[in-house]
C-alpha cells in the first residue's frame, strides 16, 4: 500500500543532532562509523537543495538548547524535523514535550541499531509520537528520513 503524500510541498526541514554527535568520526568508530557530523550535514544540505528544500541543522550537547531550538522551529516555518536525540532518547521528557508542543512532524534517527545494544537503549521517549524511527543504517538513515519527509509532502 502506498503512503499518501501530504497536500503541500515541503520547503523547510530542521535536522537536530543530540549530545556527543559532534564527536562522530572519532568516537567509537566501530559503532558509529568514520563519517563526521560535518560530512552528514553536507550530504543532507546537498540532497535537500537538489530536491528544492531548505535544510537547517543544529547540534548541541545541552538538552535546554535543543528544546529552545525546537521551540524556535515553529515560528521559523519549519515543516518537518529529523532528530537524532542520541542519549536523550532514553531520558528526555523535555524533548518529547517540546516536540509535542510545536506539533511539527518528526522522524527519529539513530546511526546504530539501538535494539542490538544495551537494554537501556531500547526505550525511546520520542518514538511513539514520531512519524517513524530509523536505526542501524548509519549516516544514510538521515538521508532516508529526508527523502521520506520530502516524498510524503509531494516533493
UniProtKB/Swiss-Prot annotation:
One of its GO terms (biological process) is chorismate biosynthetic process. It catalyses: 3-dehydroquinate = 3-dehydroshikimate + H2O. GO terms for molecular function: 3-dehydroquinate dehydratase activity. Keywords: Amino-acid biosynthesis, Aromatic amino acid biosynthesis, Lyase. It is an enzyme of class 4 (lyase). Coiled coil: none annotated. It comes from the Bacteria. The active site is at 32 (proton acceptor), 110 (proton donor). Its EC number is 4.2.1.10. Pathway: Metabolic intermediate biosynthesis; chorismate biosynthesis; chorismate from D-erythrose 4-phosphate and phosphoenolpyruvate: step 3/7. Gene3D superfamilies: Dehydroquinase, class II. Pfam families: DHquinase_II. Catalyzes a trans-dehydration via an enolate intermediate. Belongs to the type-II 3-dehydroquinase family. Homododecamer. This is 3-dehydroquinate dehydratase. It comes from Ralstonia pickettii (strain 12J). The lineage of its organism: Bacteria, Pseudomonadati, Pseudomonadota, Betaproteobacteria, Burkholderiales.
